[in-house]
Regions:
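Detector for small/aliphatic-rich hydrophobic stretches
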Residues: 4-177, 428
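Non-catalytic interaction/Regulatory regions outside core domains
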Residues: 8, 12, 33-46, 361, ...
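Non-catalytic, conformational "gating/processing" segments within enzyme and secreted inhibitor domains
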Residues: 33-38, 79-80, 117, 121-286, ...
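Short alpha-helical patches at coil-to-helix transitions and adjacent helical residues
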Residues: 86-90, 209-213, 419
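Extracytoplasmic/secreted cell-surface and envelope-processing proteins
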Residues: 102-108, 289-292, 331-333, 383, ...
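Extended hydrophobic
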Residues: 215, 267-283, 397-431
Length: 431
C-alpha cells in the first residue's frame, strides 16, 4: 500500500567543494556525513553491484548531455550573461528518471537523449567513479533523505533506492521531518557544507511544507591552469559589453602556445587545466565589430557542437598576447519548467505523472537552477544548484603569432576532453 504524498523535493547542487561520496578525488572524504539522533543512515543496508570495469566510452552520456546543453543555451535569453551546468541538470533529471515509469519516464529519457537506459546508467556510474588529478577534478556526491513517518512503495528499495545508490553513489538517510524539522534542516545543510568544502553552507532554512523526500546532488569542479597567469600581469582594462563599457581586471600571458582556430567568423582558443583532459574553450567574433551572440546563435545544435569540437584538431600556435578577464559570474534560471516542457518533458508536470516507483499521486511542480563561476590567475572554480519540486497530484601550423584579446562578449565551455562532455557552458555579455 502506498501513502499519498503532499510534496517531494529533489534538489541537485553543483557547488565549490572538495568532498563527495561518489568519486576518488584529492580532497575527497568518502563515507557518511556526521549526523545527530534525528537522522539514521540506511546506506549500509542497501547492497549494490561493483562498478563495471569494461566501460571505455561515454558516448551516450556525452551526446545526451551536450545536446541537452545546446537546447538549454538556445532557450535562454540572448541579451544577458548565462552560466549553467548541463551535467548538473541532466544528473538531477536522471535521478528523477530512476523513480519514473510509463510516459513520464519516456519523456524524461527522450529529453536527456537516453537511447539505452542500462548503458546510460553504467556510463553515469563509471563517470562518478572516475579518478582525477590533484590539481584538476570533478567531485560528485548524492544523498536521499526520507521522512521516517511516510509509507513508501513496498518495492521502493528495489525499484528506487538501490539504483540511486548503485548508479549515483547516493547515501540514504531516514529523518524525522515532522518531529524534528529544525534538526533535519541542520543535518541536510551540514551534509551539503561538508560535501562542498563549506562553499555552500546552506540550502534550506526550513523543510517546505509537506515534503517527504529530498534528493541532493552536489558536484564541484576545480581546475588549475596548465599555464597559470600571474598577478603582476593583471591590470585594469576595458571590457566592451553589449550594454556598456566597464573597467575590469584583465589577466595576461605573452608568447605562450595554445590551440587556436579561426573559421573567418568565429575564433576560439583552448585553455587547458593542469593534470587532466579538462579545458576551457573560449569563442569570440573574428571581426572587431562582430557579435558573438548573432554568430553563435544562428548555428544549429550540430553546428555549435562542431565548432566546439573543431578546437580539438586545431593548430597549436604562439599567442603573442592572451588577455582574459578575471571574473566571477553567478546566474539564476528560475522556472526551467517552460524550457523543459518545450523539450518534451510534459507529463511529469501533469496529473498523469507516473513516479510509481516512489509513490502514487506526485508530480513535478517547478524546476530551478543557479550557477556560479570564478576565473582568476590560478584557474577556475564552478558551482551550480538545481532543485526539482514535486507535489501531490490528484494523479594547420604557421609561423605567424596571434593575439586573443577577450575584451568583448564571449562564449565559453568547460569540457572534459577525455569524454568530450560539456560540464559547464556560459556566455559573458557584460562585466
Amino acid at each position: 500500500m502506498k501513502k499519498r504524498m503532499t510534496a517531494l523535493l529533489l534538489s541537485a547542487c553543483i557547488c565549490a567543494g572538495l568532498a563527495g561520496c561518489g568519486t576518488n578525488t584529492p580532497g575527497n572524504n568518502p563515507g557518511h556525513t556526521k549526523t545527530d539522533s534525528s537522522v539514521t543512515s540506511l546506506t549500509d543496508n542497501i547492497t549494490v553491484t561493483s562498478v563495471k570495469t569494461d566501460i571505455t566510452s561515454f558516448d551516450q552520456l556525452k551526446n545526451g548531455i551536450n545536446e541537452f546543453s545546446m537546447n538549454m543555451y538556445s532557450a535562454l535569453p540572448a541579451d544577458k550573461n548565462i552560466f549553467y551546468s548541463p551535467y548538473s541538470i541532466a544528473s538531477a533529471l536522471s535521478m528523477l528518471d530512476v523513480g519514473a515509469d510509463g510516459a513520464t519516464k519516456k519523456e524524461l529519457e527522450n529529453a536527456l537523449g537516453i537511447t539505452d537506459l542500462d548503458e546510460w546508467n553504467d556510463e553515469m556510474k563509471a563517470y562518478l567513479s572516475k579518478d582525477w588529478s590533484q590539481n584538476t577534478f570533478v567531485n560528485t556526491a548524492n544523498s536521499v533523505w526520507m521522512n521516517k513517518d511516510t509509507s513508501w512503495s513496498a518495492d521502493i528499495e528495489k525499484d528506487f533506492l538501490t539504483p540511486a545508490k548503485d548508479y549515483y553513489s547516493g547515501e540514504v538517510y531516514e529523518a524525522d521531518f515532522n518531529g524534528q524539522p529544525d534538526k533535519v534542516v541542520q543535518n541536510v545543510n551540514n551534509w551539503v557544507s561538508t560535501n562542498t568544502n563549506k562553499m555552500i553552507p546552506e540550502i534550506l532554512k526550513e523543510i517546505p511544507g509537506g515534503t517527504v523526500m529530498m534528493l541532493i546532488n552536489a558536484v564541484y569542479f576545480e581546475g588549475k591552469w596548465d599555464t597559470p597567469f600571474t598577478e603582476d600581469k593583471t591590470f585594469q582594462s576595458s571590457f566592451y559589453g553589449t550594454d556598456k563599457e566597464s573597467v575590469v581586471d584583465m589577466m595576461h600571458l605573452y608568447g605562450e602556445h595554445f590551440t587556436y582556430m579561426d573559421n573567418g567568423e568565429i575564433k576560439g582558443i583552448t585553455l587547458p587545466y593542469d593534470g587532466d583532459n579538462v579545458v576551457m574553450k573560449v569563442f569570440m567574433p573574428t571581426a572587431d565589430d562582430g557579435d558573438i551572440n548573432e554568430l553563435f546563435d544562428k548555428l544549429s545544435n550540430e553546428e555549435k557542437q562542431k565548432l566546439i569540437d573543431s578546437l580539438d584538431n586545431a593548430n597549436n600556435v604562439e599567442i603573442d598576447t592572451l588577455q582574459l578577464p578575471k571574473f566571477t559570474d553567478e546566474q539564476s534560471i528560475d522556472g526551467l519548467d517552460e524550457i523543459l516542457q518545450n523539450m518534451g518533458i510534459r507529463s511529469a508536470y501533469s496529473d498523469s505523472a507516473d513516479f510509481s516507483k516512489i509513490a502514487d499521486g506526485i508530480a513535478v511542480s517547478s524546476v530551478n537552477h543557479r550557477a556560479k563561476v570564478i576565473v582568476d590567475e590560478n584557474g577556475t572554480k564552478a558551482a551550480a544548484e538545481t532543485d526539482i519540486m514535486v507535489k501531490e497530484t490528484a494523479m594547420m601550423p604557421s609561423e605567424e603569432t596571434y593575439n586573443f584579446i577577450v575584451d568583448k562578449p564571449f562564449v565559453y565551455v568547460i569540457e572534459d576532453q577525455s569524454t568530450g562532455m560539456i560540464l559547464f557552458m556560459g556566455r559573458v555579455n557584460s562585466l
